[in-house]
């Protein structure tokens, strides 16, 4: 089968790899769609890989084309599925509480083992969810980031019956999906989205968000002054020092601030903002990954239900590419991230069968 292999930093090429033997609890999934995540950009071009060679890709959907002998009646050949990419140990304290995202010894498709930038992938059947009727494979690939957003919004403690104000810092794919999820789950919530890219904010306005463009120091400072202590909840999704500290400044007394993105540098919080956290009694909480299977609030079930009932994350797909185009595309995404070149894109979808 063909795979896009990261052989070293900044080097991804398509190679033929032998099919792996199917284990008893696995299903062979022929991959139909895989999203490129910002973590793939860092892993592929920012030196963030755990090992080489690596097949990346963890936002994926496909069709089951073979069953391991112990899969039983859970799935059938021909089922369209999406993949929860985290493989928990099922033995640690977190796993015993079904908090699989906090597993201390987890494995992961696309980072700690080979993932979906390939024609096929053998996936443990526990990690598969059947796509509801009418959900496309493109939307199926984006269930994973949608579930991550659902989890982050849940951490924000938005009150359903209250007219509350939420600020989302960062209008990437996650931020734009977050606007739509909030609109579905919390119609009384006023959503404000902040970013430095106008083309992303124009999209957000279609979904009913109030937007602020902060592409200069002056516009950023004006935003901080205008909205000081203005929001009941803040979700940080940009991963910059400026947005992390801004969340403290724009939060109301008693507000909850959700930190949801990885940092590429150390975060130093000025003493005045530490004092603000204390005086306003702000809650700062982290969010990572999503809740999956076995709990009353399964983010994946919520995400699938939203998509089955009209949410269309695939509408944010900027382009669809094949395996051979992954290297050049991730290079462009990385250069945009480090502000070397401009590349206006929200979500790129890989279709390995192209």
Residue ranges and their predicted role:
Residues 20-34, 47-93, 132-134:
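Glycine-rich beta-strand-centered segment in the early N-terminal region that forms part
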Residues 59, 79-80, 94, 120, ...:
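Residue-level marker of beta-strand positions
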Residues 89-169:
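NAD(P)H dinucleotide-binding glycine-rich loop of Rossmann-like/cofactor-binding domains
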Residues 135-217:
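Mid-domain Rossmann-like dinucleotide-binding core that forms the NAD(H)/NADP(H) cofactor-binding site
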Residues 198, 245, 298-354:
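C-terminal hydrophobic helical "lid"/dimerization subdomain
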Residues 218-228:
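Short amphipathic alpha-helix with an adjacent loop that forms part of the alpha/beta core around
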Residues 231-235, 256:
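Short SAM/SAH-binding signature in class I
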Residues 242-309, 351-354:
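Glycine-rich phosphate-binding loop and adjacent beta-alpha segment
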């Amino acid at each position: 089968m063909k795979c896009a292999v990261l052989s070293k930093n900044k080097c991804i090429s398509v190679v033929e790899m032998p099919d792996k033997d199917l284990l008893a609890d696995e299903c062979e999934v022929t991959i139909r769609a895989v999203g490129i995540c910002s973590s793939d950009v860092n892993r592929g071009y920012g030196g963030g890989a755990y090992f080489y060679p690596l097949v990346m890709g963890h936002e994926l959907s496909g069709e089951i084309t073979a069953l391991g002998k112990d899969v039983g009646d859970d799935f059938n050949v021909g089922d369209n599925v999406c993949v929860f990419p985290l493989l928990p140990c099922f033995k640690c304290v977190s796993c015993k509480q079904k908090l699989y995202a906090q597993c201390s010894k987890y494995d992961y498709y696309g980072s700690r083992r080979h993932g979906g930038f390939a024609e096929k992938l053998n996936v443990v059947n526990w990690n598969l969810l059947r796509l509801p009727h009418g959900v496309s494979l493109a939307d199926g690939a984006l269930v994973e980031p949608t579930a991550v957003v659902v989890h982050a919004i849940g951490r924000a403690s938005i009150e359903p019956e209250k007219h509350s104000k939420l600020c989302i810092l960062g209008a990437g794919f996650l931020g734009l999906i977050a606007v739509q999820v909030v609109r579905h789950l919390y119609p009384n919530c006023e959503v404000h989205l902040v970013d430095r890219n106008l083309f992303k904010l124009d999209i957000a306005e279609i979904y009913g968000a109030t937007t602020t463009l902060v592409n200069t120091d002056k516009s950023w400072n004006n935003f901080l002054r205008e909205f000081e202590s203005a929001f009941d909840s803040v979700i940080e999704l940009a991963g910059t020092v400026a947005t992390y500290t801004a969340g403290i400044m724009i939060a109301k007394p008693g507000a909850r601030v959700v930190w949801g993105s990885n940092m590429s540098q150390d975060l130093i919080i000025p003493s005045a903002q530490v004092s603000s956290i204390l005086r306003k009694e702000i809650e700062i909480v982290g969010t990572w990954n999503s809740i999956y299977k076995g709990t009353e609030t399964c983010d994946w079930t919520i995400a699938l239900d939203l998509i089955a009932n009209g949410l269309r994350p695939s509408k944010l797909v900027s382009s669809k590419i094949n395996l051979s185009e992954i290297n050049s595309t991730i290079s462009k995404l990385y250069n945009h991230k480090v502000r070397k070149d401009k590349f206006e894109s929200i979500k790129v979808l890989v279709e390995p069968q192209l």
